[in-house]
């Protein structure tokens, strides 16, 4: 499993890198500022970005340098979500301070700022690279048109109940959102300002903390405070597997590039890798001293294309 980046972080103020096949921790990076809320590997696989409260830090992956090579400062609350333009030209972040920010990875300072008027729980980038979709504590999903710099749509799946997590399929066929009541909402994007509710389901009886659609759009994974992860068939939203083994809340998950494996992070201080064909836990990663709340798995081929100017 060479070329695989597997990293975890959480409340013990460390980022740990793992050899995926053996379970050995190969490197520990200290993050003294705060807990780490989310981790993302850049498309070129050279860097990992860690977001906490309220800072965002960029670290080299293949290096022993313990210090961040760049910091992105501007948020005033927990940074809850982040991601990258597909070639790594820019990064987006969402925060409990009620804003979404866009950053040039190669420069200091925030490039754009969008006000949500509510704590932002989750943000995802539309595959067209021209829209961000956010979910907030007031129960709203918003679509942000990055060309026009406006909010092009706003809708509420379940009144004022907070939307915890949102994700869009790589082929833009489906948007999934979930809330603290364990309900998942499945939408068909008709246009930038029209998302049609296709299905809703009680995925868990407790919080859904993260919902993720796999790269080949075959599976939906839902992580829950009920200690399980459920794998759903995207074609008909039928349940395929319930992944059981974690002893406390499961906060985050990350699919492998070909959608065969899932990495999960839990308050039980461990991460796991699961085989999605069998639903079995293949390996457990031990070493954190407090809750693990984020995981990044990247076994894809690095995108080494140069970011376009402009």
Predicted regions and their residues:
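Terminal intrinsically disordered, low-complexity extensions flanking WD-repeat/beta-propeller proteins
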Residues: 283-284, 288-310
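Conserved strand-to-loop turn within each blade of WD40 beta-propeller repeats
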Residues: 9-12, 51-54, 94-97, 135-138, ...
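WD40-repeat beta-propellers
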Residues: 15-18, 56-61, 100-104, 141-145, ...
């Amino acid at each position: 499993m060479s070329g695989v980046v597997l990293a975890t972080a959480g409340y013990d103020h460390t980022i740990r890198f793992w050899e995926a096949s053996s379970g050995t921790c190969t490197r520990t990076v200290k993050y003294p500022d705060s807990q780490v809320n989310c981790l993302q590997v850049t498309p070129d696989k050279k860097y990992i970005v860690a977001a906490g409260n309220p800072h965002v830090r960029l670290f080299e992956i293949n290096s022993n340098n313990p210090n961040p090579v760049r910091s992105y400062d501007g948020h005033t609350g927990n940074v809850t979500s982040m991601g990258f333009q597909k070639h790594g030209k820019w990064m987006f972040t969402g925060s409990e301070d009620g804003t979404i920010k866009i950053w040039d990875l190669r420069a200091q300072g925030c490039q754009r700022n969008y006000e949500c008027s509510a704590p932002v729980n989750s943000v995802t980038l539309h595959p067209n690279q021209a829209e961000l979709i956010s979910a907030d504590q007031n129960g709203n999903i918003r679509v942000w048109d990055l060309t026009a710099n406006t909010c092009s749509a706003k809708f509420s799946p379940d009144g004022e109940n907070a939307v915890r997590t949102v994700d869009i399929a790589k082929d833009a066929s489906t948007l999934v959102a979930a809330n603290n009541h364990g309900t998942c909402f499945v939408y068909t994007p008709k246009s930038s300002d029209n998302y049609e509710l296709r299905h809703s389901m009680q995925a868990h009886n407790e919080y859904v903390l993260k919902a993720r659609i796999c790269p080949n759009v075959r599976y939906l994974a839902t992580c829950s405070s009920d200690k399980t992860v459920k794998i759903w068939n995207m074609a008909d939203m039928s349940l395929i597997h319930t992944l059981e083994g974690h002893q406390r809340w499961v906060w985050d998950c990350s699919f492998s590039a070909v959608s065969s494996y899932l990495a999960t992070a839990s308050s039980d201080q461990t991460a796991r890798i699961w085989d999605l064909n069998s639903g079995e836990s293949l390996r457990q990663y031990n070493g954190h001293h407090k809750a693990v709340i984020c995981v990044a798995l990247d076994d894809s081929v690095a995108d080494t294309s140069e970011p376009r100017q402009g």
